[in-house]
Amino acid sequence: YNPNVTIDDGSCLYYGCTDPAADNYDPNASVDDGSCTYSGCTVAPFLETFDAFGNLGPFTDDFGAGGSQGATVAWTQDASGTSSGSTGPSDDITGGGYYMYTETSGSGSNKTAILFSTCVDVSALSDPCMQFNYHMYGATMGTLEVHVDGVSVWSVSGDQGNQWNDGQVNLPIGSTGCLIQFVGLTGTSFTSDMAIDQVSVDECVSLAVYGCTDSTAINYDPAADTDDGS
């Protein structure tokens, strides 16, 4: 505010919540002050194992919910291996539990599967990250992406071997309502069943770097901190 001004030039700044999806959205605010609040958000830290059949925790399969976010095939809760050989996991990462996967037999190839979260409140975390395990085994494997607030922040394509791998993405510091999507872009045939498991939102951690840690070996990897037997 300038008391000497007689004509408003439109430069006034009004602080408040500028997100229309928030409970306390202020249509008069021009600068977001980080005060937005959202009802029904999942508060971090949390861990979703998918082990309670029929219960996906804070996540929803978009295809099963009508496909409003663009899904053309489902993420399916499963245990003990997928129906096709030479693709997909044989078990969940801990053994004996459930995971989420995309079935690409029949009409499931060249499709998009979307698993989306409720809003996630990470404001209690100083360095928020989402950690998860993924399995991408198959000769015609497609692409797995993670989107945060509509932006792709992580992507892996192609056959990653017949094992569970570790993934981690940073989440926006201070956010009281970020949105997460796992987007599976299936491959060209039935050997592209991808899966995810053990999704957690917590403080960031240092992930293991697998490779040959023997400095006398010809394939020694100085960046590796965990030997993978190669």
Question: What spans do the regions from the language model cover?
Answer:
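Extracellular carbohydrate recognition and processing domains
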Residues: 150-175
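Short beta-strands within extracellular/lumenal beta-sheet-rich domains
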Residues: 106-129, 165-167
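Extracellular calcium-associated, cysteine-rich motifs in secreted modular proteins
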Residues: 1-42, 206-230
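Extracellular carbohydrate recognition
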Residues: 108-113, 186-204
